[in-house]
């Protein structure tokens, strides 16, 4: 953001500070370290993080769901968003819990 504010040439192609565009990005949980996942949640919000598996490649986490469940400092709401709530919202589908509650 500093260069954008300080240099006119940095503003030639983008009208807003670079950090404002980060709000449009989504991140996945393939960070391999619970501290990094907690940082993503703190920096960008749990509503911008999706469960990642790295499938079909072999470099993913052995159990991506447990990784999210065991990451310290995440609320149950955070976990719910990351483990499917965000994907459901982005895809325009009802999360499984909402569908089951209607039965």
Please report, for each region that a protein language model flagged, where it lies by residue.
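Aromatic-lined glycan-binding groove of carbohydrate-active enzymes
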Residues: 1-22
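Generic detection of intrinsically disordered/low-complexity segments and helix-coil linkers/edges
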Residues: 15, 20-21, 38, 49-51
């Amino acid at each position: 953001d500093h260069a954008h504010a300080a240099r006119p040439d940095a503003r030639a192609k983008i009208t807003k500070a670079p950090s404002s565009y980060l709000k449009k990005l989504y991140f996945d949980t393939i960070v391999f370290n619970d501290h990094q996942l907690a940082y993503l949640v703190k920096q960008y919000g749990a509503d911008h993080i999706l469960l990642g598996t790295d499938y079909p490649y072999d470099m993913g986490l052995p159990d991506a769901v447990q990784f999210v469940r065991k990451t310290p400092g995440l609320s149950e709401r955070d976990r719910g968003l990351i483990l499917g709530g965000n994907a459901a919202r982005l895809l325009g589908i009802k999360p499984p819990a909402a569908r089951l509650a209607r039965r």
